[in-house]
From Swiss-Prot:
Protein name: Large ribosomal subunit protein uL30
Organism from which the protein derives: Borrelia garinii subsp. bavariensis (strain ATCC BAA-2496 / DSM 23469 / PBi)
GO CC annotations, alphabetized: large ribosomal subunit
Pfam families documented for this protein: Ribosomal_L30 (PF00327)
Entry keywords, A to Z: Ribonucleoprotein, Ribosomal protein
Length: 73
């Protein structure tokens, strides 16, 4: 989980967001944030450019996702 925090602290990079936990039983706010990121079910992956709004969304759902840097998109 510490690696996620290190990636979020960087600026202007592309990150791949991977959903590793289920949405069942989660707060409606977190479910809406994940759907806005394009993650609907376990195993979904999306690439996002890391800006301030995406950082806030990732911080809100940090315990349900896995992040990795992407060099070329």
């Amino acid at each position: 989980m510490e690696k996620n925090r290190e990636i979020i602290s960087k600026n202007n990079i592309n990150v791949q967001v991977f959903l590793v936990r289920s949405l069942i039983g989660k707060l409606n706010k977190k479910v809406k944030v994940l759907k806005a990121l394009g993650l609907n079910k376990i195993g979904d992956k999306k690439v996002h450019f890391l800006n301030e709004s995406i950082k806030g969304m990732l911080n809100e759902t940090i315990n349900m996702i896995l992040l990795s840097e992407v060099n070329n998109v």
